[in-house]
Amino acid sequence: MDRNIFQNVGILYRSYLNYANSFLKDLGLSFSESVVISNIGASEGITQEGIASLLCIDKAAIARNVKLLETGGLIEIKKNADDKRLKKLYLTQEGWEKYKAITAANTDRLADLYKGLTPSEISTLETVLNKLADKV
């Protein structure tokens, strides 16, 4: 039976959630906290609003996770020197350790998923997914 794109994306998402929740439990993180850490690590100094906009996630949800991560000592919040209303987010040393573990686990998962695909197929897949996500 052929599946449509939504079914395939759903299958991949649920599979990834199961995988992620397994290794995140050992790190003491929730999935949503790991998403915030990953985005700060990839773009230090990003704001809460920047993460919310990038991921199409509610600002309040990001704010809750930022508060938890700050309380847990994984991130620092610094006010922008030019605009005190802007709060930039940075990983602490412990936050960087968690980021590296998350990134390594994600890299391993992608390597497993990409087995049997050619570099051209992988490139095409990533290009098409980026184009679709840009339309949202």
Briefly describe each language-model feature range:
Residues 17, 67-127:
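Charged, amphipathic alpha-helical coiled-coil/dimerization segments
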Residues 27-33, 61, 92, 118:
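Short helix-coil-helix linker/hinge
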Residues 1-27:
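N-terminal leader segment of winged-helix/HTH proteins
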